Each structure stands twice: as structure tokens, then as C-alpha cells.
């Protein structure tokens, strides 16, 4: 099964540089370190190929300023942000971003679920090229997740306007709503509704305050009864592209500047319950116990062992355990825990689960318990369109940037929209692979590199899609 490994392929283009230009870059690097704001962690830029930014069409300073301003909405004292979907903080941030869209000359609208679209007309009657991301965050999240792709998309429009470039396809910048999901427990909510994956059944979902999604939509000024109006018709889109931070360590550790995403991994999640017998912890001999927690602990290690035994980059997680009755002097009689498996290949997920079930059955026999599992989430992999991958790769190389092909282990809105149209994603490095935390960071040079690749990719797609 070695062929299931996802190789990291690298191509680095070196430019001849003079002694003078190297000296100027050294001085500029020291000066640049002084102007980083306290809103973002400090890091010296180790990426070499694009440090001068001489060939960029986008305005890196404008982009940085807009991102720094956005980071003020929901800023936490310890750094990072808390900007949950459908919260007042996110509403305020949305108002700011819609203002940026209008400044870029976009025609702005909000759909029935709260997704924001900014449209730039094309010169021909063609399907729309869609690109953007999200601005909501997890609790105590970082400043770059989603925001780089959202404001990077707006910067692409600015750059096109600055250069007086027209496109044949209409262009739409999209800010998807509630991508992270902690508010209602539904990830990629806005894009899921747009792709007809989610429907009116989600309107009664409640948050921790007891408010339903329908309640929040009314606060947005939307009519919940029109939720399905947010669905994007098939044939309306030419392609979707999302710029995002990697949220993993591969690009940062290998010093590769751009990730060309092969696809977004599939995710399957089970709710498991191990049932034993609750009994007195002091009077029940060890050889007479039916300890549900002991069994669940073995099950957790079984998940880890099975996933590690597979060649490739698959992952498996047991994220929590709920122990009942949860007292220090009572043998646990019931334990609830989830099992989550992710891989770019659905067959690999199913094979791992079969082996995990065999291990669970063995543990049940050893510990005298019964473990039952039920599927609660099953999301198929979203494979990037090969032609869009090629466009992104060529756009990177034309800008003198190194590339690597890699999968996305995280869920993204582009994956939902891939059900409707060809999809591609652009990754930029995340320092130490940290994300969903205040320490999340990508250098400004990497952010600008990714936005430049997005700019070039959109122009290439505009030309190539016409020829099909």
C-alpha cells in the first residue's frame, strides 16, 4: 500500500542576485522587523525567493494593513481572536469587510444564510470565478485562519483595478459564514447551504444560549424560510479557488513557499459507548471488574496503533471521554467517546475502521464490556481539479516561488463547493504548524506570496476556462 503515501514534490527556482541587491535586502529585512505590530507574533522571514516582492502585482502593504485592522475585531488580551460565527463581534467584522469590498468597487450582497458576495462584472456572459474564505474563528483562535484568503481575495480585486485589467468571466469574492462551527456544531455551514449539502433541517439547531440558527438569521436581517435561496445553481460557477494558511508544519519545515492542495481529506466520525458495570471501587476485586474506562483507554490506543500502522498521512483521533458516573470511588460503568478518521482516500478510512472494530471486539472480551459505535458524520474527500492544480502550480513558478503538492487535513469551504464546480486551493506556510491558537502565524511575505499566486491563478483561469 506504499502507493497511498502522498509525496511532497519540490521545485525551487533560484534567481541571480547582485551583491548590492543582497545588501539592500539585508537592510530592508532589519527595517521590516521593526514595523510589525504587537497584534502578531514576531518572526524573521526565512523564505528567500520572493523577499524583494519586485514582481508582485498585489499591494502587500495595503493587504497587511487591512489584516491588522480586521484582527482588532474580537482581539483577546493574550493575542489572537475570538470571533465566532453569528456573534456580534463577527457581525461588526463583517461590516468592516463589506466596506473593504465596496472600496474595491465590488457590488455587495448577502445571501439567505449570511454568506457575503462581492461581484466584479466580466466582459462576457460566462460562469463566475469564485474565490475567498471566511472571517469567523474558533474560541481563542489565530489572526490568519480564513482571513488571509478573505482579504487576499479583496486585494486581488484592488490589484486588477490598479492595473486596469478586465476579465471575461465575472469575478466574485465570497466570505463564507460560520466555517468553524463551534457556535452551532456545524462546520462549513454557509458553504454547505450554498452547495445544498445542508438545508432547512439545521434551522432549529441551538447554540449555548439557547438561540436557534433561525434566531441568528433574523438578527442578520435574513428570513429563515428562504434559507434554500442561498443555494448556488449548478453551472453558475466556472471554478472556485481558496487561499488559506496550511495549518500544518509541512511547508514551514521544508521551507517551501506555496502548497498546491491535492484535495481535502474525507472525514468519518463515530460516537462510541463502552458499557461495563459500575461498582464500589474499594470492595470489587480487580479480577471481577467490568471497567468501561479501562476498555475505552485500550480502545483509544487501538485507534492510534491502527492509524500509525498504515502507510500514508492518514490521522485518527479520540477527542474526549465522558465517564459515568465519574466519581473517584466508583468503577466507571459507561464511557462515551468519539473516533474520528481522516484521509484523502475513503477506502483507507474504511479499512482502518474495520481493523479498529476488530481491536475493540478483542478489548470487550478481555474487559467484560460491550462497545457500540454509530456513525455521526461522514464527509467524502474533495479532490482538487487537476487543471486548477496546474494553474496554481504554474502561477507560483511564474512568480519565482517554490511549490509542494500536499493534501489538506482540515475541512475548508472550497471542499463543499467542489460538489458544484472545479476546485483548487493555495496554501502558505504556518509557523511550526500551529493553528486555532493565538500563536498562529504566517509571515507577511508568505501572505503576500499566496495572494500574488491567487491573482495570477485567477487571470490564468479566466483565459483557460474560456478555451474549454
Predicted regions and their residues:
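N-terminal hydrophobic or amphipathic helices/low-complexity stretches enriched
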Residues: 45-81, 121, 330
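A non-catalytic alpha/beta surface segment that caps or lines the substrate-entry region
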Residues: 75-121
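A short beta-alpha structural unit
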Residues: 85, 319-326, 338-344, 370-389, ...
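Alpha-helical metal-binding/catalytic segments enriched in His/Glu/Asp
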Residues: 131, 140-180, 268-274, 280-306, ...
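Midchain, well-structured core segments that form catalytic/ion-binding scaffolds
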Residues: 178-179, 183-347
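His/Asp/Glu-rich mid-to-C-terminal helical/loop segments that flank catalytic regions of hydrolases
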Residues: 262-264, 280, 284-310, 348, ...
